[in-house]
């Protein structure tokens, strides 16, 4: 039997991650120890959970907008109480505005659509095209506009993933989006290329483990795979390499590497194994088609944790469906129309009875899912920390209030310091450190049982409050995981500088214009840094 390393086979799924990443890191660690150098740091990751249609902001935000937030503070919150156990590892980022807000007047962004342009610009910070000239149901680009640049996940992945591999993009509940319907699309490989990602748990598990094909692996085949060590997999390659003339130093390095593989690899996997997969509930029997979001969402999050555990991807984005039937939560209707309070797609009219309570139920469920993800990441040790500690795990929301559709005062909650890059245990108001910033007025959206379009700005957050550009926070995240920039501060492959600029504009009023690209407020938010 050939003992030649098949790169195509090994890199097909978990094999590449399990062998290449952990053992290369171990070799570096061993080499560092023998030479008295610092042990290489654990990988840094960006993990994103994205939800649509905003929230009840005055129930989501705490009263304190700048200062320490304790476990008791979170426990007292209406929506974020499930996050209380992780309070000392949380960073609530306040004062942020996302780019390209929709309105009838087009004063804070383009006029295409409250969802299409927001999703297209959210992680790109680029305008969408075509640029609608009016706000109407029949305007150009209402449902199919595309951003003029690629999204953050791809910008990061090409630098921090091995070989510039694509990010892991998980569409919880199934793949959504097409070139004729881009309302919910957030991941763009390029302006003309939607990145669909993965929408089926079984597909993701198969991609990760390489053990599961159309059907389960037989017990004999599985045990055979488990018995193979790394040396078994690459024995012929190793022998061929040993026959190549090399210096004594290289011979010693090669012998040390082989010894290390024998020491560390009773199997070809370390934490990246079936035991940990099973501990996450990721067995072949459990990961089957079907089920509603109550089971699919935590399963997909567990798969994201397994991917992080295996170092299979250092940029992991996941999203819930743009609009879904919420009956499994005991709520009648779909999430989009519930968010509008009217029971339909219109933004004014008679409020549906108990619509505010229904929104709260959905908001609380999202918080429970994020708490599940954070708890799983925090349960696995990585060096002297946990997976969570070595990551920046961020819950982003498409908008602030779901009927006002405002993008200022954006709800953002980060878990994990990403290797002590970020300050945690705090709410930090990057606008002015004001501890009493408004939490918004979402509970006022149905006064006298009506939603009035003329009052939408008042129901959300006044447009001149919490307006600092999200671009700068993206610079924080990129710098934290090791993305580099060129001399101009924009992220670029092969760069050597800190990232200080991202996107076309950081002024949302410029998005409907044809103004030259300009970043008015470069740099990251230093207040978010641990030191």
Where is each model-derived feature located?
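Ligand-binding pockets and gating/stacking loops
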Residues: 1-531
């Amino acid at each position: 039997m050939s003992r030649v390393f098949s790169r195509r086979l090994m890199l097909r799924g978990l094999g590449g991650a399990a062998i290449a990443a952990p053992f290369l890191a171990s070799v570096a660690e061993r080499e560092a120890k023998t030479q008295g150098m610092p042990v290489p740091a654990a990988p840094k990751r960006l993990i994103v959970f994205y939800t649509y249609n905003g929230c009840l902001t005055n129930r989501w935000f705490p009263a304190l907008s700048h200062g320490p937030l304790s476990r008791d503070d979170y426990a007292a919150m209406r929506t974020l109480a499930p996050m209380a156990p992780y309070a000392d590892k949380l960073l609530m980022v306040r004062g942020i505005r996302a780019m390209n807000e929709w309105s009838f007047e087009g004063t804070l962004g383009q006029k295409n659509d409250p969802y299409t342009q927001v999703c297209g610009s959210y992680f790109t910070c680029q305008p969408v095209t075509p640029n609608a000239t009016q706000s109407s149901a029949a305007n150009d680009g209402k449902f199919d506009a595309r951003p003029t640049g690629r999204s953050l996940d791809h910008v990061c992945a090409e630098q921090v993933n091995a070989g510039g591999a694509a990010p892991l993009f998980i569409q919880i509940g199934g793949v959504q989006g097409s070139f004729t319907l881009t309302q919910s699309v957030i991941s763009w490989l390029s302006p003309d290329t939607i990145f669909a990602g993965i929408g089926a748990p079984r597909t993701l598990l198969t991609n990760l483990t390489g053990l599961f094909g159309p059907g389960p692996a037989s017990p004999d085949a599985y045990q055979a795979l488990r018995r193979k060590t790394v040396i078994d997999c690459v024995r012929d390659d190793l022998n061929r390499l040993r026959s190549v003339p090399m210096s004594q130093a290289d011979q010693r390095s090669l012998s040390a590497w082989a010894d290390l593989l024998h020491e560390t690899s009773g199997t070809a996997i370390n934490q990246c194994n079936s035991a940990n997969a099973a501990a996450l509930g990721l067995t072949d029997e459990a990961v089957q088609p079907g089920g509603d979001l109550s089971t699919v969402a935590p399963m997909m999050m567990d798969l994201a944790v397994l991917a992080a555990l295996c170092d299979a991807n250092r940029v992991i984005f996941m999203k819930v469906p743009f609009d879904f039937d919420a009956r499994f939560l005991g709520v009648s209707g779909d999430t989009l129309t519930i968010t509008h309070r009217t029971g339909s797609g219109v933004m004014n009219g008679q409020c549906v009875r108990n619509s505010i309570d229904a929104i709260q139920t959905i908001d609380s469920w999202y918080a429970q899912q994020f708490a599940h993800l954070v708890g799983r990441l925090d349960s696995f040790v990585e060096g002297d920390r946990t997976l969570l500690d070595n990551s920046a795990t961020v819950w982003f929301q498409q908008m602030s209030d779901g009927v006002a559709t405002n993008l200022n005062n954006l709800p953002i909650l980060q878990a994990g310091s990403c290797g002590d890059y970020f300050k945690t245990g705090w709410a930090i108001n990057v606008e002015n450190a004001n501890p009493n910033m408004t939490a918004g007025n979402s509970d006022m959206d149905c006064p006298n049982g009506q939603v009035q379009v003329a009052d939408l700005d008042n129901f959300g957050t006044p447009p001149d409050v919490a307006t600092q550009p999200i671009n700068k926070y993206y610079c924080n995240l990129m710098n934290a995981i090791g993305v580099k920039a060129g001399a101009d501060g924009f992220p670029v492959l092969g760069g050597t500088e800190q990232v200080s600029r991202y996107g076309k504009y950081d002024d949302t009023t410029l998005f409907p214009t044809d103004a030259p690209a300009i970043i008015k407020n470069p740099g990251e938010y230093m207040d978010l840094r641990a030191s």
